[in-house]
Amino acid sequence: MGDEDWEAEIIKPHISSYVPVFEKDRYSSGANGDTFNRTPASSSEMGDGSSRRDHFMRSGFASGRSLGNRDPGESNKRENTSTVGGFGVGKSFGNRGFSNNKFEEGDSSGFWRESSIDCEDNQTRNRGFSKRGGYQDGNDSEALGSSRRGGRGSFRGCRGGFGRGSPNSDYEQDEGTQRSGGIFGSRRSALSGAGNGDTFQSRSGGGSGRGGYKGLNEEVITGSGKNSWKSEAEGGESGDTQGPKVTYIPPPPPEDEDSIFAHYQTGINFDKYDTILVEVSGHDPPPAILTFEEANLCQTLNNNIAKAGYTKLTPVQKYSIPIIQGGRDLMACAQTGSGKTAAFLLPILAHMMRDGITASRFKELQEPECIIVAPTRELINQIYLEARKFSFGTCVRAVVIYGGTQLGHSIRQIVQGCNILCATPGRLMDVIGKEKIGLRQVKYLVLDEADRMLDMGFGPEMKKLISCPGMPSKEQRQTLMFSATFPEEIQRLAGEFLKSNYLFVAVGQVGGACRDVQQTILQVGQYSKREKLVEILRNIGDERTMVFVETKKKADFIATFLCQEKISTTSIHGDREQREREQALGDFRCGKCPVLVATSVAARGLDIENVQHVINFDLPSTIDEYVHRIGRTGRCGNTGRAISFFDLESDSQLAQPLVKVLSDAQQDVPAWLEEIAFSTYGPGFSGNARGNVFASVDTRKNYPGKSSLNTAGFSSTQAPNPVDDESWD
């Protein structure tokens, strides 16, 4: 993202910086549909000539071709690639431009050609708009020996036409990227790139040369396609530094006490949590606690816990709270819906209340004591609401920042005081880069859904975070990781973040599915899925249902299809604007749309009350993702149902892990699925091949201390057979 005057926005937040791209009454179509007359805002905007002031050339044409002649020498200077969108550098069209007087015979430039300008040759004349927002003067181009002509239709890595033709910095030869200005290249000027576009980067990210309007099958506004600038998981969080200026400011959450402390109703199986087996590994773990009173929390925290409806601890809370209070690093694995958020928030808040806080709205630089990072915007906002609930009536202030919202709004929230910063990775690194927060006071670093935070999607950003100037080393801070799944390779990566003596807590059948969720696997071909989905949803009625698909385009397609079938449906995925995502979740929560079609952006950590059904229209590529998806139902002891469509052609690799997950959760395993698993993996296949009651175990070699404990009595016990072990969510 280019530099912006955030101080001005902070001082005058009520002044909008948005400038409309087109004003309908400012131009009109001529008789032939080619010419658009426009009254300019200033003479400098369109150039000095009167003919330029009287006309506005509308960029675009959804074509992979460009208007105007191509410099014959250019083919040797840049790749021979077609440009998608307005006025690119591909094939030229003669006599298709816009002229003040008339089209002259043999003139193929046409772009507001002024008869008063004496062009020495066709190449110079065809450039048009010399030394302004459109096409740079031919002599400058020749002298520079490289393609620096503003945004002539967005070639190679430049997404917007009409760049500012600065001969000094539009094209960075060392970086090999062009920076653009103008409506589709710059975010500062809505019409012609009159603002300096040099500081703005191309939006395409992947180097695609996409121009003014949508071309081919790619989406210009959302940036979807194979060179999409948004990440699927975080919905564009990694793309916060690209694209048009974001002006969306999310509405503040309700401030009344009843809304803050609205709580989940526990289900009929909540009391089964006491029978769950827990394994703690590492040196000298502290004893677990049985009640909130044993945690020695301050009275304000105890009052907030009671208001939130918390009456008893879940297994992960019984072990994690004393470990965190003892200052130990922690990696905790617990099934979905098990209260992991409260497990780390309560001891952190207790420490802050006891030791005091440093951040204040009266300080120029905010230095939070705790940073919590999660992979999706929806999840981090959910964590923030929990932090706000538990810190109600205290001096601790929690702040949430995430992508898809105005960066100035995020900064304004921070400067008002920030003790606990809840953030998604991209927006966090943006704010750190702007030097709006300091890291010297960080005492707690929390990674929620840590397996996702450390994989290839966010691993580099997390490593960049812990190496930022001022960030305390892992020996000087306390690092906490929570997730429902912790693959072995992720545990190895975690060594860079955690102290060597960290404790590992595994609760129940970690990495397995909850037995409160009834799982059904149906063998459905790819082209029969839609009809089967409609059949199931009609039988379900208005019960709240989440439908998971693999791609963003399919999410919108299925949602539209279901609406045509008179089934009220909305969708959420990474290409939707943040306001649309929040609106979709709001419609789903309130029951306006009982069906939500989602990609994996909604599979992680979202806690939506009373979701009765999860349907895997497309099975995910990994069994861990399957566990996270079906974990959206059957939470806090409530029951739920998960139905998955199994396609033989695309899902066979999941047969073996599916059989294991179903067996561990004491679910019926279809005979046809066992046959596929047996034929795929051979006669040695076993549904419980690992032989462990814990699906995720500490992978450290020769770690000292390991105990299997029952959460009710906390006595060491022999691990029971999985078939006899009660499960929970």
Curated annotation (Swiss-Prot):
InterPro entries: DEAD/DEAH_box_helicase_dom, Helicase_ATP-bd, Helicase_C-like, P-loop_NTPase, RNA-helicase_DEAD-box_CS, RNA_helicase_DEAD_Q_motif. Keywords: ATP-binding, Cytoplasm, Developmental protein, Differentiation, Helicase, Hydrolase, Meiosis, Nucleotide-binding, Phosphoprotein, Repeat, RNA-mediated gene silencing, Spermatogenesis. Its main location: cytoplasm. The modification Phosphoserine is found at residues 224, 228, 727. Residues 230-249 are annotated as: Interaction with RANBP9. This is Probable ATP-dependent RNA helicase DDX4. It is found in: Cytoplasm; Cytoplasm, Perinuclear region. Its EC number is 3.6.4.13. ATP binds at residues 334-341. It catalyses: ATP + H2O = ADP + phosphate + H(+).
